[in-house]
Design a protein with these regions (language model features):
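Short, basic-rich loop-to-helix N-cap that marks the start of a DNA-contacting helix
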Residues: 69-81
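Helix-turn-helix/homeodomain-like alpha-helical modules used for DNA recognition
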Residues: 98-139
Length: 139
């Protein structure tokens, strides 16, 4: 069973031996590659790269990311999450695996993105909300 983040933090704080702690919790660390996770999600969601490209609003660039020809930026991954109809939690994990900051509800722009994800809005509807608030859009 996976250990929650707070339990890992508490364990690290109280650990006498970091090596023993790391060995004990090996299965709790994020080790999956971004591409592997994206492919896993595509399979789970039963979507194609073409559908993701269309629904994310970033078009052909998606193919370069899925073929490891380009590194995705944070906003690009968020756009892809809309294109794959990911949940908020799946999007957060996607950002963690890619080593990006997760969406933060205390940030106005991120708050709008979180709202859009939680309410099943499209990326275009999300961008309208961002634009109406004079914030940088995703696409």
């Amino acid at each position: 069973m996976k250990t929650i983040t707070q339990e890992l933090l508490d364990g690290l704080k109280n650990a006498d031996d970091i090596k023993a702690f790391l060995d004990l919790h090996e299965q709790d660390f994020l080790s999956q590659s971004l591409i592997d996770y994206l492919n896993e999600l595509m399979s789970e969601k039963n979507v194609t790269v073409a559908q993701v490209a269309k629904n994310s609003g970033i078009g052909e660039y998606v193919y370069k990311i899925f073929n490891s020809e380009r590194n995705a930026k944070r906003d690009t991954l968020v756009a892809i999450s809309f294109g794959m109809h990911l949940t908020f939690e799946e999007t957060q994990l996607l950002l963690r695996i890619a080593k990006f900051a997760i969406l933060d509800s205390r940030d106005r722009r991120d708050g709008i993105i979180i709202y859009a994800l939680m309410h099943g809005l499209s990326i275009f509807e999300c961008d309208d909300l961002l634009n109406n608030d004079n914030l940088i859009t995703l696409v």
